[in-house]
Amino acid sequence: WSNGEEVTANDFVYSWNRAADEKTAADYAYLFDIIARNYDGSLAVEATDAYTLKITLTNPCPYFNDLMAFPTYFPVYQKDVEKADPDGKNPGKWCQEAGFVSNGAYTLKSWKHNESMVYVKNPKYYDADNVTMDEIHIMLSADDTATYAAYNSGDLDFVDTVPNDEISTLNGKNSDFHIIPNLGTYYVGFNVNDPIFDGKTVEQAASMRKAMNLLIDREFIVENVGQTVQIAADSFVPAGMSDGNGGVFKTDDISYYDADKTGADQVEEAKKLLESAGYTFTDNG
């Protein structure tokens, strides 16, 4: 740990059980569902010695090593957690200010909320000799224009986003501008309890949703909104998702949107679906 104490297997037993506990309300608690449970509800994770964990899974999991590389599986310092939140009412309080104990390459030296963070090299890190930067300053801002201006003025060495209207100017014309792939899907979801579905059968409601799906011009959004070579989604699962066995899940997925159809084809099919749901169209639409 950054305070010099040794990280042991028991730190992981504590941290994983804490993250999986409903009382913690961790966003990614479900990632521990692959681990079996003991009779008392705790995870079937045992520290057989100071450096060894025995983990019992509910079933074979080829991607378990990948799961353990996810931050939710990282250890937290039990003394800090319990000191900051003795009654368990605010599980995240221990890390809401700078100075908490951690075990990464850097420790958080200062944190001005919504403004900046300063990280310093952790001399206790197991591989500290290969950590080349002594200090990192991070600007916190949701304003792309402000961060981009700070970059251009030399106040920042790196920014991970730029204003959309700058993309066409930078892409392919500035050697510092790079587009990095990101695994994800932007989608529209429906509140099926909305009054718009009142009085509709299950089939009619499904037709309405399918029609909206057909009427979204993905290519227009990719080209004019995203502008960074995104791929029009033809499935809920994004391209490049691993299937857990070394393959790509997307290749076996069933597309729900045919990117080869023309816009006119999509509109006509959507109109038929809406008509089947009880909508009528006039010459004016």
PLM regions with names:
Residues 1-26, 54, 202-204, 208-211:
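Aromatic- and charge-enriched surface segment that lines or borders ligand/interaction sites
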Residues 11-13, 29-83:
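Surface-exposed binding/hinge segments that line
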Residues 92, 97, 123-169:
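Ligand-site clamp/hinge motif
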Residues 120-125, 184-211, 224:
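A bilobed periplasmic-binding-protein/Venus flytrap-type ligand-binding module shared by bacterial periplasmic
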